[in-house]
A protein has these predicted regions:
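Low-complexity intrinsically disordered tracts that form flexible linkers/tails across taxa
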Residues: 275-289, 659-667
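Glycine-rich, aromatic-lined ligand/substrate-binding cores of catalytic
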Residues: 748-783
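Extracytoplasmic gating/loop element in the C-terminal half of outer-membrane beta-barrel translocons
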Residues: 190, 481, 775-805
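Extracellular/periplasmic, surface-exposed regions of secreted and cell-surface proteins
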Residues: 3, 208-211, 246, 252-258, ...
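Acidic, glycine-rich flexible loop segments
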Residues: 212, 282-317
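Short aromatic-centered micro-motifs
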Residues: 99, 464, 729, 761
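Short, small/polar-rich motifs associated with maturation and membrane association
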Residues: 1-257, 262-271, 317, 331-333, ...
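Conserved small-residue
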Residues: 158-193, 421, 620, 637-749, ...
Length: 805
């Protein structure tokens, strides 16, 4: 049985009595305003979650079936979040959904900087019927964000802010100083006694402080309005010396002309963030847990950090706090959109945007952590130029209604990078601010990069409905990318969907308790370019050493990639069928979706012979993977009165992933990869030297499964000691810990089932809301317990209190 991960959030607040729960409201709006062929999900964050929100991604968490938001790193505010829409669809390709903010192509990092108070709504596109319109960028789903604009109600101003504190909820229960000494003496082991009783978690942690402020004002009339907002956040994390600051500025203006036939939308968005971190946070906590507790918290009388030379895997935690890993990111984008009603049913739209980003990173590792020290500086810049033009037509005659859109767009990107690394620090006082004062430049430590990919697209869609009851929609998008090979420059991504509004049929028209009943199905294809760069298809070279030619040092070059003229994007085909049901005036609403998707032409890197090839690796489109599942959403309004209202919303998703194949043909050559490949291993003392892999990629299994030796317990040896009794699973008389040896599949690392629920209750102006998120059907490997209960590393390394038992 899998582990259960449960998140419970309870918030109290005061708000206007006119607000109703967003999910019920949005489901009603969705069913009333969109075609029965669609399965879009709209989320309005100002109503869904109330109380403090750290960033826009907090709004998405638990709100939509099949959409999982997780945090990478120790600091959930400063580190990048991960979003998966209906699971993992690729090994080497991108798995992040495409993010569109006010029509501007963006990414999750930028989305995480937007203040929730600036967001009008989210729209989540999951099925290929919808994502096919984004072609080669839509295979992992699409998240469209619409930010707030001017209301035209005259001048308005708003402010919201909050202060908060944070601390570690739970510490590892490690041996203290006296317990450490007593255990070592009881076991007859030699140990170092520094004479202290230090809790090294207290050395590296503190009570964190966060405060954020958001100011917005808007004004104007219905024909000409604006909205501007400013946001600031300062977060001192629970790790000493770590902090994160973010400043956001946003401006939007809308202008109408020619009696509203021409509408112009102009927007500017910019943010600047600074992160002060250390070089390796994982090593910091590992060192704090494993350090000898009898050592001092600071330096000795000579100013040196006390360390057991036998404990080579760790450093003094206090010394690690002097590491630096500082980042500064600036982002600016602006857009202009125009819509002109040529005729009452014919609209010409044009949109253009420009985005600029700059990221600087500086790292410093002092000589008391690394013998020669280490300094790194890097600067990365990016520019995006985007434009599209579309023509939309709609018309109704008799019982028929037709909507049609044709368009074209072009995206040009420029990416540059420059970085340098050095060792041999003259003095730690320079930190990373004087690389010239270092004595050693590692080969390959200084380099630069450049790429300028482009994407040109044409698209069209048609939706026809009869009697506002039967609907059919078809779409086709063609993409031409500079990153794929000449043989596959263009790719085409079609979709078709059907919808039936059953409630409007005669046999249900008199059924009063059913308010809505709609059925839909669809099929579509989308692409994935995430695993390809501007140089992936080329036989590229790279410097591989320095030799002396005629007495002059000369850099030699060598191949690092084979040419593949047939390389192209991955293709994901999806079939879905679903329904929406509302009863008792939509007081109870059910929505469900069943889907199956298959990724083909999956990118993977294969071993190839040399000299047949110039390099021993070849990336090719051969593998395949499937995802299937069912999603369920339930919304209930058990109480709905003037002064009292209660809303209950629940969503659940079951998802099954399977790696189907990694073998196939390439130009008459059979290409194959190992059926079992390690993708995750243990790290730490006692876990090196091989046989420490725990997570695997196995053909025929979900991507990321635990494949482990089976321990039956303890067995006594001839000397009266005990050792682990490992089962010989293949009955060959030997215990083999290697990959594919005596191991069994112990479970998968990703959840099979995820749930999200929101319960809100309002009485007059008092509201209370509760959110519960959960994940089921997966396993969590307790590497922490394995590392800190291993008595073979004691007393050089610290262990947990229960380990000696």
């Amino acid at each position: 049985m899998g582990r259960v991960s449960l998140c419970l959030v309870i918030m109290f607040f005061i708000c206007s009595a006119q607000k109703i729960d967003a999910q019920v409201q949005n489901i009603r709006e969705k069913q009333d305003t969109i075609s029965a062929t669609k399965s879009l999900e709209h989320i309005r964050p100002e109503n869904i979650k109330k109380g403090p929100l750290n960033n826009a991604l907090d709004v998405l968490s638990g709100q939509s079936a099949g959409v999982n938001v997780t945090t990478n790193g120790t600091d959930r505010l400063a580190m990048l979040n991960s979003i998966r829409v209906r699971g993992t669809t690729s090994i080497m390709g991108g798995n992040d959904p495409l993010v569109i903010i006010d029509g501007v192509t963006s990414d999750i990092a930028t989305l995480s900087t937007i203040y929730p108070a600036d967001i009008e709504s989210f729209t989540i596109l999951k099925n290929a019927t919808e994502t096919a319109m984004y072609g080669s960028r839509g295979a992992s789903g699409v998240i469209e964000i619409k930010t707030k604009k001017g209301t035209g109600r005259g001048f308005e101003i708003s402010y919201d802010g909050n202060y908060g504190f944070e601390s570690m909820y739970k510490h590892l229960q490690m041996l203290n100083g006296p317990e450490y000494i007593a255990t070592a003496e009881a076991l007859g082991l030699d140990y170092n006694n520094g004479g202290y009783n230090t809790n090294f978690h207290d050395v590296i942690t503190r009570t964190g402080l966060i405060h954020q402020h958001h100011l917005a004002f808007s004004g104007g009339s219905e024909n000409s309005n604006y909205r501007a907002s400013f946001g600031f956040m300062d977060h001192n994390t629970i790790v000493k010396v770590n902090d994160y600051r973010n400043l956001v500025v946003k401006l939007d203006a809308t202008q109408k002309a020619f009696d509203g036939r021409l509408v112009g939308d102009f927007g500017v968005y910019g943010y600047s963030s600074k992160i002060h971190d250390i070089f390796d946070t994982r090593m910091l906590f590992y060192s704090a847990a494993a350090q000898n507790p009898t050592y001092p918290a600071g330096t000795d009388v000579n100013g040196n950090w006390v360390k057991n030379s036998a404990a080579s895997h760790i450093n003094h935690p206090g010394a690690l706090l002097y590491e630096k890993n500082d980042s500064e990111e600036r982002n600016f984008n602006t857009h202009l959109g125009l819509k002109f009603n040529i005729l009452d049913n014919l609209i010409l739209s044009a949109f253009g945007s420009y985005s600029y980003s700059s990221t600087g990173n500086a790292q410093f590792c002092p000589t008391w952590v690394w013998a020669q020290g280490n300094v790194y500086r890097g600067e990365f810049k990016g520019e995006d130029y985007f434009t599209n033009v579309s023509l939309s037509y709609n018309n109704a005659w008799g019982d028929s209604h037709l909507d049609a859109v044709v368009g074209a767009e072009y995206l040009k990107q420029v990416r540059t990078g420059l970085w340098v690394q050095a060792k041999g620090i003259t003095t730690n006082d320079f930190s990373y601010n004087n690389i010239g004062a270092t004595s050693s430049r590692p080969f390959g430590g200084t380099s630069s990069s450049y790429e300028d990919p482009s994407l040109a697209s044409i698209m069209g869609s048609v939706t026809y409905s009869y009697k506002d009851r039967y609907s059919i929609a078809a779409a086709l998008r063609g993409d031409g990318s500079s990153m794929v090979s000449d043989n596959n420059t263009f790719g085409f991504f079609p979709s078709v969907s059907l919808g039936w509004d059953v409630k409007k049929e005669g046999f249900l028209s008199d059924t009063d308790f059913i308010t809505i009943l709609k059925l839909r199905t669809g099929y579509g294809r989308s692409g994935n370019l995430g695993g390809i760069t501007s140089y992936t298809t080329l036989n590229t070279v790279k410097e591989n050493g320095i030799v002396s030619i005629n007495g002059a040092p000369t850099v030699t070059m060598g191949s690092i990639r084979n040419t593949n003229p047939d390389l192209k994007w991955e293709t994901r085909s999806t079939f879905n069928i679903g329904f929406d049901l509302g009863i008792w005036d939509n007081r109870l609403m059910l929505t469900s979706e069943l889907y199956y998707s298959k990724t083909t032409d999956m990118l993977y890197e294969y071993d190839v012979p040399v000299p047949t090839f110039a390099f021993d690796k070849l990336m090719a489109n051969i593998g395949s993977m499937s995802n299937q599942g069912v999603e369920l959403g339930i919304s209930v309004v058990p109480i709905q009165r003037k002064d009292m209202e209660m809303n209950i919303n629940f969503n659940m998703s079951y998802q099954k992933n399977k790696l189907l194949s990694l073998s196939g043909e390439y130009n008459g050559m059979h290409m194959t990869a190992s059926d079992i490949t390690p993708i995750g291993s243990l790290y730490g003392v006692g876990q090196n030297g091989g046989d420490n892999n725990v997570v695997y990629q196995i053909v025929g299994q979900p991507l990321g499964v635990f494949c482990l030796p089976h321990c039956k317990g303890l067995k006594e040896n001839e000397l009266g000691g005990y050792s682990y009794d490992i089962e010989d699973l293949n009955d060959d008389g030997e215990i083999d810990f290697s990959d594919g040896g005596d191991r069994y599949i112990a479970g998968q690392a990703t959840p099979k089932v995820t749930i999200g629920s929101n319960i809100s209750f309002r009485y007059k102006s008092f509201d209370i809301a509760m959110q519960i998120n959960g994940a089921f059907g997966h396993k969590i490997f307790n590497g922490t317990g394995l590392a800190y209960t291993n008595m073979s590393i004691f007393p050089d390394y610290y262990v947990m209190k229960g380990a000696p038992e």
